[in-house]
């Protein structure tokens, strides 16, 4: 069984039934209400010890297994504090939940190494995050903490390690009239459940996605891997336009820049190398996060896709 078989679970829609772990907590309550207001098909939540009650007019369950059996949910979003978040992810894997979106920042790295070890040895569950804004199919389903109102149904697939820079790309693609087909925040931690390649594979196969924005940052080699994947799978006359921005061009080596994974270590993970790798794969790299929308618009113009 191959973990990559679960990539298809990233494609959420208005038919996706969602539950929330950490449902009755402060974050869970706030963001669940936002999701309901957006129109997400949220069908219940989990709060151990509070099973049988209702919250926000929805049923509360003691376990993910119980919630999945009772509601038929195919996705769960996790707003559980860092010390208990890995256990929450594991519980969702046990229940074979097709999509798990973990928002929590600050999960101990050792916990995530163990989760990841388990994750890649199964094919039922796809994890997005941790330390990410989530996944949204505009106008249909919002799983996570992204502001719904800036999104607009459209043609661009967006994948990013940064939350706020995702919102920048979203707002700009909405403003130039291209909109978004699917936006995935893969998170800023070094050990996460979904990488650039997973998302690029979904975008390249999706007929609704006509262009791609990839937002990376210093640290690790995910961008270099993504560049190699694009070179292999997105070249020739039918290639989809890809625009990218890499944060941290001026970052000093050895200093962690906001995200746990955003660090230049052992002389590797700098922005220059990442930019060069992407350009070599035919990606148009924008030097400013403020020009992502205009850059992809120009690429669409060039290819007469407008």
From Swiss-Prot:
GO terms (BP aspect): tricarboxylic acid cycle
A Pfam family matched in the record: CoA_binding
Cellular location(s): Mitochondrion
Residues reported in the UniProt entry to bind CoA: 24-27, 50, 103-105
GO molecular function: nucleotide binding; succinate-CoA ligase (ADP-forming) activity; succinate-CoA ligase (GDP-forming) activity
SUPFAM superfamilies found in the cross-reference section: NAD(P)-binding Rossmann-fold domains (SSF51735), Succinyl-CoA synthetase domains (SSF52210)
Main subcellular localisation: mitochondrion
Substrates-to-products reaction catalysed: succinate + ATP + CoA = succinyl-CoA + ADP + phosphate; GTP + succinate + CoA = succinyl-CoA + GDP + phosphate
PROSITE patterns recorded: SUCCINYL_COA_LIG_1 (PS01216), SUCCINYL_COA_LIG_2 (PS00399)
Catalytic site positions: 259
Top-rank EC class of the record's enzyme: ligase
Annotated substrate binding sites: 167
InterPro entries referenced in this protein's UniProt entry, alphabetically: Cit_synth/succinyl-CoA_lig_AS, Citrt_syn/SCS-alpha_CS, CoA-bd, CoA_lig_alpha, NAD(P)-bd_dom_sf, SUCC_ACL_C, Succinyl-CoA_synth-like
Gene3D superfamilies found in the cross-reference section: NAD(P)-binding Rossmann-like Domain (3.40.50.720), Succinyl-CoA synthetase domains (3.40.50.261)
EC number: 6.2.1.4, 6.2.1.5
Pathway in which this enzyme or protein is active: Carbohydrate metabolism; tricarboxylic acid cycle; succinate from succinyl-CoA (ligase route): step 1/1
Keyword Ligase: yes
Keyword terms, alphabetized: Ligase, Mitochondrion, Nucleotide-binding, Tricarboxylic acid cycle
One GO cellular component term noted in the UniProt record for this chain: succinate-CoA ligase complex (ADP-forming)
General function of this protein: Succinyl-CoA synthetase functions in the citric acid cycle (TCA), coupling the hydrolysis of succinyl-CoA to the synthesis of either ATP or GTP and thus represents the only step of substrate-level phosphorylation in the TCA. The alpha subunit of the enzyme binds the substrates coenzyme A and phosphate, while succinate binding and specificity for either ATP or GTP is provided by different beta subunits.
Matches recorded under HAMAP family: Succ_CoA_alpha
Subunit structure: Heterodimer of an alpha and a beta subunit. Different beta subunits determine nucleotide specificity. Together with the ATP-specific beta subunit SUCLA2, forms an ADP-forming succinyl-CoA synthetase (A-SCS). Together with the GTP-specific beta subunit SUCLG2 forms a GDP-forming succinyl-CoA synthetase (G-SCS).
PANTHER family documented for this protein: SUCCINATE--COA LIGASE [ADP_GDP-FORMING] SUBUNIT ALPHA, MITOCHONDRIAL (PTHR11117:SF2), SUCCINYL-COA LIGASE SUBUNIT ALPHA (PTHR11117)
Family that this chain belongs to: Belongs to the succinate/malate CoA ligase alpha subunit family.
Protein name stated in the entry: Succinate--CoA ligase [ADP/GDP-forming] subunit alpha, mitochondrial
Organism field: Columba livia
């Amino acid at each position: 069984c191959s973990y990559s078989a679960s990539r298809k679970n990233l494609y959420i829609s208005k038919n996706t039934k969602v539950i929330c772990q950490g449902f009755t907590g402060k974050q869970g309550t706030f963001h669940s209400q936002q999701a309901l207001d957006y129109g997400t098909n949220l069908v219940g939540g989990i709060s151990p010890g509070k099973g049988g009650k209702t919250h926000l007019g929805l049923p509360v369950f003691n376990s993910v297994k119980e919630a999945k059996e009772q509601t038929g949910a195919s996705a769960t979003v996790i707003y559980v504090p860092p010390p208990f978040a890995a256990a929450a992810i594991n519980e969702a894997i046990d229940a074979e939940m097709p999509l798990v979106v973990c928002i929590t920042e600050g999960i101990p790295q050792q916990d995530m190494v163990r989760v990841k070890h388990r994750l890649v040895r199964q094919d039922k569950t796809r994890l997005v995050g941790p330390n990410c804004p989530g996944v949204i199919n505009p106008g249909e389903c919002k799983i996570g903490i992204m502001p719904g109102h800036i999104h607009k149904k459209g043609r661009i697939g967006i994948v990013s390690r940064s939350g706020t820079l995702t919102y920048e790309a979203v707002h700009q693609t909405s403003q130039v009239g291209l909109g978004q087909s699917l936006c995935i925040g893969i998170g800023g931690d070094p050990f996460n459940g979904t990488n650039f390649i997973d998302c690029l594979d979904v975008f390249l196969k999706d007929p609704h996605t006509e262009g791609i924005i990839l937002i990376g940052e210093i640290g690790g080699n995910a961008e270099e891997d993504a560049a190699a994947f694009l070179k292999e799978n997105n070249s020739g006359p039918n290639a989809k336009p890809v625009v990218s921005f890499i944060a941290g061009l001026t970052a000093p080596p050895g200093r962690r820049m906001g995200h746990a994974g955003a660090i230049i270590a052992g002389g590797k993970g700098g922005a220059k190398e990442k930019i060069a790798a992407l350009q070599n794969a035919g990606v148009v790299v924008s030097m400013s996060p403020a020009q992502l929308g205009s850059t992809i618009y120009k690429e669409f113009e060039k290819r007469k896709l407008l």
